[in-house]
């Protein structure tokens, strides 16, 4: 549990905010120096997501998506805008959202809102989104705040909507990264938080073809 590794919650959040302010507003910056894996990541995410957009009667709509921890819009640009009519972005770092407006180019006109906010304080508009995409950011929330955020996301879904978490998973327990002030949780810990938020796991997939030295990355589709 994060309560065992985070001594000071306020400092946990403020330190992360300070860390990201110093990160370059580039794809490489967003990916911690692993910019070269961006295409591998996006292509796998697209395949994972499309199975829900293609199904019959209960298929997920393609009108509105929300990109959480969006940074400069790497995922918005390459995954969400090509598949959805309108995208909203939320990120704690204002400079990233400013950069997004040029990085996204012409298609960026279909980004409706740029919310500058930490996810612990963010509430998606109820019944507004077909897909809420949460990638490489859950480690910046405490267990309690993550569960509460997921509950708010659940309320933010349109009929047949889904939440996707894509993130690093530890082998066991919870590991604190003191550099960027984040945690990495084991898959079973994330499952427990997901259940506590009243969500069910629809699908789960491990990301392939990533460098050996980084954590295993999993995608979880939830409703």
Curated annotation (Swiss-Prot):
It is an enzyme of class 2 (transferase). It is found in: Nucleus. S-adenosyl-L-methionine binds at residues 69, 74, 91-93, 119-120, 135. The keyword Methyltransferase applies. Keywords: Acetylation, Methyltransferase, Nucleus, S-adenosyl-L-methionine, Transferase. Gene3D superfamilies: Vaccinia Virus protein VP39 (3.40.50.150). The modification N-acetylmethionine is found at residue 1. InterPro entries: MeTrfase_NTM1 (IPR008576), SAM-dependent_MTases_sf (IPR029063). It catalyses: N-terminal L-alanyl-L-prolyl-L-lysyl-[protein] + 3 S-adenosyl-L-methionine = N-terminal N,N,N-trimethyl-L-alanyl-L-prolyl-L-lysyl-[protein] + 3 S-adenosyl-L-homocysteine + 3 H(+); N-terminal L-seryl-L-prolyl-L-lysyl-[protein] + 3 S-adenosyl-L-methionine = N-terminal N,N,N-trimethyl-L-seryl-L-prolyl-L-lysyl-[protein] + 3 S-adenosyl-L-homocysteine + 3 H(+); N-terminal L-prolyl-L-prolyl-L-lysyl-[protein] + 2 S-adenosyl-L-methionine = N-terminal N,N-dimethyl-L-prolyl-L-prolyl-L-lysyl-[protein] + 2 S-adenosyl-L-homocysteine + 2 H(+). One of its GO terms (molecular function) is protein methyltransferase activity. The modification N-acetylthreonine is found at residue 2. GO terms for cellular component: cytoplasm; nucleus. Its EC number is 2.1.1.244. It holds the Pfam family Methyltransf_PK. GO terms for biological process: chromosome segregation; N-terminal peptidyl-glycine methylation; N-terminal peptidyl-proline dimethylation; N-terminal peptidyl-serine dimethylation; N-terminal peptidyl-serine trimethylation; spindle organization. PANTHER family: AD-003 - RELATED, N-TERMINAL XAA-PRO-LYS N-METHYLTRANSFERASE 1. Belongs to the methyltransferase superfamily. NTM1 family. Distributive alpha-N-methyltransferase that methylates the N-terminus of target proteins containing the N-terminal motif [Ala/Gly/Pro/Ser]-Pro-Lys when the initiator Met is cleaved. Specifically catalyzes mono-, di- or tri-methylation of the exposed alpha-amino group of the Ala, Gly or Ser residue in the [Ala/Gly/Ser]-Pro-Lys motif and mono- or di-methylation of Pro in the Pro-Pro-Lys motif. Some of the substrates may be primed by NTMT2-mediated monomethylation. Catalyzes the trimethylation of the N-terminal Gly in CENPA (after removal of Met-1). This is N-terminal Xaa-Pro-Lys N-methyltransferase 1. It comes from Bos taurus (Bovine). The lineage of its organism: Eukaryota, Metazoa, Chordata, Craniata, Vertebrata. The gene is NTMT1.
């Amino acid at each position: 549990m994060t309560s065992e590794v985070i001594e000071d919650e306020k400092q946990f959040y403020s330190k992360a905010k300070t860390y990201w302010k110093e990160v370059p507003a580039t794809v490489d910056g967003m990916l911690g120096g692993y910019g070269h894996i961006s295409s591998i990541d996006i292509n796998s995410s697209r395949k994972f997501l499309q199975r829900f957009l293609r199904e019959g009667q209960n298929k997920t709509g393609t009108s509105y998506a929300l990109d959480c921890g969006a940074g400069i819009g790497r995922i918005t640009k390459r995954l969400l805008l090509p598949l959805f009519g309108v995208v909203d972005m939320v990120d704690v770092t204002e400079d990233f959202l400013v950069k997004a407006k040029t990085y996204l180019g012409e298609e960026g006109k279909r980004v409706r809102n740029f919310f500058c906010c930490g996810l612990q304080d963010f509430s998606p508009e109820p019944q507004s989104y077909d897909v809420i995409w949460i990638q490489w950011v859950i480690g910046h929330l405490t267990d309690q705040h993550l569960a509460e955020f997921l509950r708010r996301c659940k309320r933010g879904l349109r009929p047949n909507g889904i939440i996707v978490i894509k993130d690093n998973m530890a082998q066991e327990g919870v590991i604190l990264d003191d550099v960027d002030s984040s945690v990495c949780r084991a898959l079973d810990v994330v499952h427990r938080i997901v259940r506590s938020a009243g969500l069910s796991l629809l699908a789960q997939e491990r990301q392939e073809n990533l460098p050996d030295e980084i954590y295993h990355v999993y995608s979880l589709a939830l409703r």
